């Protein structure tokens, strides 16, 4: 396999738009059960915040050597401030919209004991119509200055009007990669690539009986949405790509699966950088598959660097 195209990636300008969240981790030790209820008591020893959702996609893009601009909606709160600070530290260009209507920035707090997740607490609230309008207006101003658009949909509200974003990007000559959510796939019509996982694909086309059945359903969906390509991420079964040239598959490369959270973000980021660097869909899938195999061996939402991919 050829080396990762780092020199070409450095010139790539990728715009990431979607649902932004903060992943907060509390690490500790468990050595007793609470006398108040039959639950473990975690003695917190370390705290860590990481970029999540679309922000994790942008962070992975930068780690792979490309330029990333992050656009989405955050609240005027502590979690939103942390996202801005962490993005700056990672080298992500900031095009965030701050919702001053009282919106809570999406925050996922995980409590871990002995490297095992014991509890997750979510704080989330959708953006206001005014914030979404500002997001749309800002998007129209900057999308044409980028080589590729990535849409990271976690169904938190930032991509409520995703159809207009895709249309504007294609009119500007910008390719669009989408990580979808839900079963309303007609929202993504006109995108270049959609990357459902196995469960999301079942939501979109129903259960399949054989690989031949899946191929028929996948190609029908690709034609219906006018996609160049459809890529299904299938966990331990690898990845399968569908284009006008047919079906192509790569087997999974993970040696040990430790944590799958954020793995889809890394896969999407790698696909985006590889495509922006001039690689074809199949080559991009091979690199994304390798990146996915690396990141699931790490704890929590993590990144994969170009150096890791090339070794």
Q: Which residue stretches match the model-derived regions?
A:
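Conserved post-catalytic alpha-helical subdomain immediately downstream of the catalytic base
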Residues: 228-229, 253-311
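Short glycine/proline- and charge-enriched loop/turn segments
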Residues: 32-42, 195-200, 248-253
